[in-house]
Amino acid sequence: EGYNFETFFKAIFCWKEIINDHKYINNYDYNKAVYLMSNINLLDNEFLLLKEDINFSSPISVLFYEYYENFSDLKKTLELEKENIQCIVSSMEINQKVNFGDSQSPNLWDYADDVDTLDFLLNLAN
């Protein structure tokens, strides 16, 4: 709790030109209008909307976030939702996490959804 999103917004500012894509801005404008008409609190940096929401899938131009009170609560939530999570990118000590910068360059032993693909395919016939 109490995270200051200013650091996050500064880090992604280099992507601000995405708002010039007509399909993206249509999504941004639509989602912003729907949320504002519904009196939903948003964080807005003029090209990305941040909405506090525990759901996994956010609309285009929206990023969902969730607060947690302490690290053990976060770890419990991640464990409960592990079937719904494909990849956790973090510098924290979390089971089966991927380091920043490595999510698009997996090792041979890193399996999507933690399923050994070869083992899965070999056991299909059984």
Model-based region annotation:
Residues 1-126:
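NAD(P)-dependent aldehyde/semialdehyde dehydrogenase
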